[in-house]
């Protein structure tokens, strides 16, 4: 009986979201996700225009969505892995 109870507790802990787990991309290419720190509950993708046909892309976690400008397009979202 104790084994069954312990198994149920372990399964419950594994299945429940017990902490902060927002996941966002953290590299220019959409390959590697990272868990955001506490307080940063949005994913951000910033596309920066460097030359007429060249762009840099920055992805990561943020607490406040920055504003877009003429040379920087900012897209924020608040679900896991949404900054592709």
Curated annotation (Swiss-Prot):
GO cellular component entries: extracellular region
Claim: Disulfide bond is one of the keywords in the record: yes
Family according to the record: Belongs to the three-finger toxin family. Short-chain subfamily. Aminergic toxin sub-subfamily.
Purpose: Acts as a beta-blocker by binding to beta-1 and beta-2 adrenergic receptors (ADRB1 and ADRB2). It dose-dependently decreases the heart rate (bradycardia), whereas conventional cardiotoxins increases it. At 100 mg/kg, intraperitoneal injection into mice provokes labored breathing, impaired locomotion, lack of response to external stimuli, and death (after 30 minutes).
Disulphide bond pairs: 24-43, 36-61, 65-76, 77-82
Localisation: Secreted
Signal peptide: 1-21
Gene Ontology terms for molecular function: toxin activity
Note from the entry: Negative results: does not affect blood coagulation and does not show significant hemolytic activity.
Protein name per Swiss-Prot or TrEMBL: Beta-cardiotoxin CTX14
Species annotation: Ophiophagus hannah (King cobra)
Alphabetical keyword list: Cardiotoxin, Disulfide bond, G-protein coupled receptor impairing toxin, Secreted, Signal, Toxin
Tissue-wise expression: Expressed by the venom gland.
Source superkingdom: Eukaryota
Pfam families with a match to the protein in the record: Toxin_cobra-type
């Amino acid at each position: 009986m104790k084994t069954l109870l312990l198994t149920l507790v372990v399964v419950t802990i594994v299945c429940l979201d017990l902490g902060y787990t927002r996941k966002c991309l953290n590299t220019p290419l959409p390959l590697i996700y990272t868990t955001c720190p506490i307080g940063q509950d949005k994913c951000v993708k910033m596309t920066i225009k460097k030359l007429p046909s060249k762009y840099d892309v920055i992805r990561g976690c943020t607490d406040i969505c920055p504003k877009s400008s003429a040379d920087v397009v900012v897209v924020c979202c608040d679900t896991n892995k949404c900054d592709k």
